Every structure is written in C-alpha cells, then in structure tokens.
C-alpha cells in the first residue's frame, strides 16, 4: 500500500494535511497493534539456530534500505571467507519455504521481490517459519544467516541485531501503525538492538543518541549513471520519492514520476499505462531493481532498472560490529 500522507513528519499535527481526525480514529487500532506486539515479544521463546544469525531490521514500515544493506553485509562476510545467506519471509510470494531462491526458476510471485533481488547477487532463502528455514540453511552449508527484516519476529534467536534507519525520514510522525509508520515504539525497538545503520545524510536522531548504540553511517550509491534522454520513473517502494530524487540528483532527466504502493504487483494494465505515459513524453521507462523483478516477464526487457548499492563510510567499524559473529562462525 502507499504510505498515507499524514505519516509524514513534516506536517503541523493540527493541520488538515496531518489528518488529526483520522489519526484520532486510528488511535485505538494503534494501541491494539502495540499491545499485540508487546504480548508476542513477551511470550516468545526464540529457537537457537545451528549457525550465527544477524538480524537486519527496522522500526518503520518500509523505505529504510534494508535490502541493499543486507546485500552489502552479505558481501562483506563473504569477503572474509564465510558462506553467508539471507533469509526473508518472502512477502508477496506464494511459496511458504524453506526454499533456496533460484532466479532462473522463481518469480516475485513465487518468493517475493526482495528475496529474488538478493538471489541475483548471492545466496537467498525464504521461509515463513524462520527456525525451520534456519535449520535447512545450516544443513545446506550456510555459515552465517542474515535475517532480512525480522526485528519484530521473535521466533528465531538473534546473535546480532542491526537496525536500519533512514536519516532523511527516521520515524515519520512518531506514531505506531496504522496511525503512523512505526512498527513499535522507538526506545523499545532500539533496546533490543546492538547497533544502528543510519542511511543517507542527516543528523543522528535524538532517540538513537539516547540509546548509546554504535552508529554506522551508510548511503545508497548508484552503480551506473542514469541513462541519457528523457525518463519516466516509477517505483513501488516504501518511499518512491526517494528514488525519484536520487535519479534526478544523479543527473537523470526525469520528465515524470509515478509512485505505486510498496511491493505493488505490476499488471499488464499498469505497464500499458506507463508505456502510454512514456510515449507522451518521448521518454524511456526506468524503475528500481526491486520493482523491475515484479514486472511481467514480457515487459522487463524494455524497461530500464537503475541499480544502487549500500556503501558504508567506515568498513572497519562494520567489521568491529561483525567481529563476534566471525568469531562464533570460526573465523578469527
């Protein structure tokens, strides 16, 4: 779904745009959601995996950059000589898992967009039952499991928890779902974490400073310059505007931009609409790599994908955070 406009932090809470009546009506649902999450976390008995588990999660609904961060950390672990694999729930996919994702056989409708994207550059698994999936991964030879987006899932014991926060839009309006974008109260989420990865430019949020957690700075960097000529950009991610702005700032000639809801399953009708829009502008279509894998197969060859990667400012600091995991996995 598209993030409601009133989730934004840049609004006067009493203004019409901030939808004070809507927020008031959603307050009981936010309280119920928070009560259910706290109860689930309190009653949980996490199962230990046969190998170390690194959780890469966040505190908001989408848009923080977990997937490229997961890919970058997986690459860092692999460069140390260890076999690392990502584990996702497989949101939006029909397969329950445990399943090793194969880009040659699976589509986003099978396994979800993020696992399919991660499988394009390394080993990726899905599993709705995380402990069962972790056992299957270890039996297959994985030495370290990167649990993509599992901070609010207590079923699997984590050896290290990293929270990804978008420095440009850390916590939205500060309210919990559905009143705001937060999956839980910020201090409670940070209390279960070991470090914070702050994505992009912006100050360290006061809540993070108060937590005394180590902060790793990272940013998204394009792997290639935007293609020349006019472009019609579209995206169905947590913060589509972030993609549009990045594309323009990198020199892309963005004639028009179309936001879709997060994890939007593109249809032939969507593609036809986008083709028509591009034709009107005399432009080519371009989207994120995550959106590209959700396109109908017959449309993927004609639509451009603009790849980005997560770059850590201080890789030595990242290695220091990962050191206990390396040690447990048998790599001094």
Curated annotation (Swiss-Prot):
Keywords tagged on the record: ATP-binding, Kinase, Lipid A biosynthesis, Lipid biosynthesis, Lipid metabolism, Nucleotide-binding, Transferase
GO molecular function: ATP binding; tetraacyldisaccharide 4'-kinase activity
EC number(s) reported in the record: 2.7.1.130
Alphabetized Pfam families for the sequence: LpxK (PF02606)
Top-level taxon of origin: Bacteria
Annotated GO CC locations: plasma membrane
GO annotation, biological process: lipid A biosynthetic process; lipopolysaccharide core region biosynthetic process
InterPro entries in the record: LpxK, P-loop_NTPase
Record carries keyword Nucleotide-binding: yes
Chain intervals for the UniProt region annotation (Disordered): 84-113
Reaction(s) catalysed by this chain's protein: a lipid A disaccharide + ATP = a lipid IVA + ADP + H(+)
Binding locations of ATP: 60-67
HAMAP family xrefs: LpxK (MF_00409)
Role description: Transfers the gamma-phosphate of ATP to the 4'-position of a tetraacyldisaccharide 1-phosphate intermediate (termed DS-1-P) to form tetraacyldisaccharide 1,4'-bis-phosphate (lipid IVA).
Assigned protein family: Belongs to the LpxK family.
Protein name as catalogued: Tetraacyldisaccharide 4'-kinase
Source organism of the structure: Hyphomonas neptunium (strain ATCC 15444)
Lineage: Bacteria, Pseudomonadati, Pseudomonadota, Alphaproteobacteria, Hyphomonadales
Gene name of the encoded protein: lpxK
